[in-house]
Swiss-Prot record:
Pfam families: Ldh_1_C, Ldh_1_N. One of its GO terms (molecular function) is L-malate dehydrogenase (NAD+) activity. This is Malate dehydrogenase. One of its GO terms (biological process) is lactate metabolic process. NAD(+) binds at G7, A8, G9, H10, V11, G12, D32, N94, V117, S118, N119. The active site is at H174 (proton acceptor). It comes from Chlorobium phaeobacteroides (strain BS1).
Length: 310
């Protein structure tokens, strides 16, 4: 198993290290355009092997040739958000970057699974799908796992319970229009609505929607990376080990939820072939309406990129 991580910034490097530590691949390639950065970080990771007790080979490179025959490609390249920026503000700049990256990686790896992390997430996943010409099952985005993790962490903090006992789904676009689905949120099987007042739930939902911006505002010059990297690696683990995990991911919907030809966060079954099934769960009317509105925002932004992707 060979996994390539594109982008040796905070998210990419953290993800590469977690992949190596968990021995999800025999070889991890960390790619970046800045000479020395991926090589130095990869060597540092490899040298942690005797302490972390892993044998994964980790290489850094600025040459796409070294990514050849990758089974999974994690794309984290792009500009990070700054205070006051929305994910959509990054649209044109990161679309150009993701287009170039995708064009290059598929030259050397013929049938990889591509996991997108670059923002704005759902739109960049669309860019990766169009440019790679891979089957839709093999191009997906990391969004809902992260958004759900944030929602779960806020619930655990509020109730002072273990995060392990929290189950939650956040669907829709990876942005302010995301849709935390409260009806499927539970604590050790107990519906959240039985443990928490509605106004408190609404506060946590709002905080989840603004979770990325909250961290950006603290950091001033950068964005979240521990939780995004961990979320991406959870998806990789599900694929590498064919776990058939049900996780919320950005997937190409073709009629599900009344949404057509748009990448948006939905519950999927993840296995060795990528997305093996998109689950169409029952949503309340307001949730379904919010999901469709979220998809409409993604679709509009994708349409604005038509000339770039031609």
């Amino acid at each position: 198993m060979k996994i390539t991580v594109i982008g040796a910034g905070h998210v990419g490097a953290t993800a590469a290290h977690r992949i190596a530590e968990q021995q999800l691949a025999n070889t991890v390639v960390l790619f970046d355009i800045l000479e020395g950065i991926p090589q130095g970080k990869a060597l540092d990771m490899y040298e942690s092997g005797p302490v972390g007790l892993f044998d994964t080979k980790v290489y850094g490179t600025t040459d796409y040739n070294d990514t050849a025959d990758s089974d999974i490609i994690l794309i984290t390249a792009g500009m990070a958000r700054k205070p006051g920026m929305s994910r959509e503000d990054l649209l044109m700049k990161n679309a150009t970057i993701v287009k170039e990256v995708t064009d290059q990686v598929v030259r050397f790896s013929k049938n990889p699974i591509i996991i997108m992390v670059s923002n704005p997430l759902d739109i960049m996943t669309h860019v990766g799908y169009i440019r790679s010409k891979l089957p839709k099952e093999r191009v997906l985005g990391m969004a809902g796992v992260l958004d759900s993790a944030r929602f779960r962490s806020f619930i655990a903090e509020e109730l002072n319970v273990s995060m392990r006992d929290i189950n939650a789904f956040v669907l829709g676009g990876h942005g302010d229009s995301m849709v935390p689905v409260v009806k499927y949120t539970s604590v050790a099987g107990i519906p959240l609505t039985e443990l928490m007042a509605q106004d408190t739930i609404e506060q946590l939902v709002d905080r989840t929607r603004k979770g990325g911006a909250e961290i950006v505002n603290y950091l001033k010059n950068g964005s979240a990376y521990y939780a995004p990297a961990s979320s991406a690696v959870e998806m990789i683990d599900a694929i590498v080990n064919d776990r058939k995990r049900i996780l919320p991911c950005s997937a190409l919907l073709e009629g599900q939820y009344g949404i057509n030809n748009v990448y948006i966060g939905a519950p999927v079954k993840l296995g060795k072939n990528g997305i093996e099934q998109i689950l169409e769960i029952d949503l309340d009317a307001p949730e379904l309406d919010a999901l469709r509105k979220s998809a409409a925002i993604v679709e509009e932004n994708c349409n604005n990129l038509a000339s770039l992707l031609a």
